[in-house]
Amino acid sequence: MSNLCRNIKVFFKVFLYRFKQNKLNQAAGYLTYSTTLALVPLIMVFFSVFAAFPVFNEITGELKQFIFTNFAPSTGDAVGEYIDQFVNNSKQMSAVGIISLIVVALMLIHSIDRTLNSIWLDTSVRPAIFSFAIYWLILTLGPIVIATSIGISTYVTKFATYTFEQDLGLSVGIKLLSLMPFFLTWFIFTVLYMVVPNKKVSIIHSAAGALIAAVFFTLGKQAFTWYITTFPSYQLIYGAMATLPIMLLWIQLSWTAVLLGAQLSAVLADMRSLDDSNIQIEKMKEEK
């Protein structure tokens, strides 16, 4: 019991120290700025990839709804109009304009890569060609993976909901299905924490950090939506420009949740290293 309390105390000390060391608030602000610049290019690339695969035409609506509810709570209608405008405008762009947008999107991925690796205290640098290949795969395959996951979850939800409706005694199952977006978010964060760092990250540590990030992300989304709908004074202040500060604030909160989860995963790895070191020390003492 004493060892457990000691480990918990050490964990929180290490977590707070690393939080200050990595300046997560500043890092979240930096990623918010990068995301704002790359938002339009990312949307353009995502939906351009979907357009290249007719199989995803049926879930485009579900994908937009996923973006609205998770990344733009309470401003879904306005963001939906912007997305349609972005996609339509991208069809009229020149090759130079498209390349420029792709470069901006790749720069965001690079920013995420560098920020997460700094949390794991990894200062190694990949070869430029290797990094470009990884970023390009993320930019092109990422939308396909996300669309496939959303499509599967949507299909399972609809099928299971229909099945449960045939049996009133299984109403609990319908409530469990409402957690599908949460599990999808948890899965995406887990993959993010495993794939992006240059160091090998345990799936247990990644899943633990991703779980906390998904919880904060989901609770933050609900609290943010409640505040926006309950205290709409921001509309009186900003008027037609209200969507912009709302988006910026939500992006900031989202990145804070993501970085906190990453920090938790990294600290768990640090704690494991400390435990291994203590075991080695004890063995050396016993041998003496």
UniProtKB/Swiss-Prot annotation:
A Gene Ontology term for the protein's cellular component: plasma membrane
Membrane topology, as annotated: Multi-pass membrane protein
Subcellular compartments: Cell inner membrane
Keyword annotations: Cell inner membrane, Cell membrane, Membrane, Transmembrane, Transmembrane helix
Organism superkingdom: Bacteria
Listed transmembrane segments: 36-56, 92-112, 127-147, 176-196, 200-220, 240-260
First-listed, main subcellular location of the protein, grouped into a coarse class: membrane
InterPro entries for this protein: UPF0761_bac (IPR023679), Virul_fac_BrkB (IPR017039)
NCBIfam families: PRK01637.1, yihY_not_rbn
Family to which the UniProt record says this protein belongs: Belongs to the UPF0761 family.
Descriptive protein name: UPF0761 membrane protein HSM_1104
Native organism: Histophilus somni (strain 2336) (Haemophilus somnus)
